[in-house]
Amino acid sequence: TFDPVRDLQELGYKIDLSDFSIVKNPLEITVVTDIMRNFTDDSRTYVLTARRGDSLGPIMDYLDQIEINSSQVRPIATQGESKGDVMVVMMKNKIMPNGKSNINRIEYYEDSQKNIDDVLQKICDNPEINDIKPDNFELIVYKVINNGDRYNLQKIEC
């Protein structure tokens, strides 16, 4: 798989990613974190980050600091991999005896239109997973929009 950091390092570039293991001056986006605080106990909450794996500890520590129980959150460092591809793999790995995925709803909060487009393309109508989606499957994307002094959510569906 394409990894620009690894590929540049193989060419001899020295790349210092140590800052990515630190959560610096985070700004809580309460329109999202308030929702996270109210997820039911039977839901599975994942935090997908494009950062590398060593950032997961600081991210989880930050969630605890803002009173989100990090033990109920599963972090995934995609390391630049497509978030849509990660979701496809997750769905394929959670197959029930009836041949359908046990993931029947994905709520995805994202500020990057590029990432939103990727997820919509790979989840909404993908022949690779269409037949394993449960009949009641829902993908609900919320675009996180920064309006200067506050954030809003724009709902996007397949």
Identify the residue ranges that each predicted region occupies.
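Structural beta-sheet core signal
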Residues: 47-49, 108, 143
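A short acidic (Asp/Glu
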Residues: 55-65, 86-89, 115-124
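A short acidic, often aromatic-flanked loop/helix-cap motif at beta-alpha or helix-coil junctions
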Residues: 78-86, 147-154
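Conserved Lys-Pro-Asp/Glu-containing loop-to-beta segment of HAD-superfamily phosphomonoesterases
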Residues: 83-114
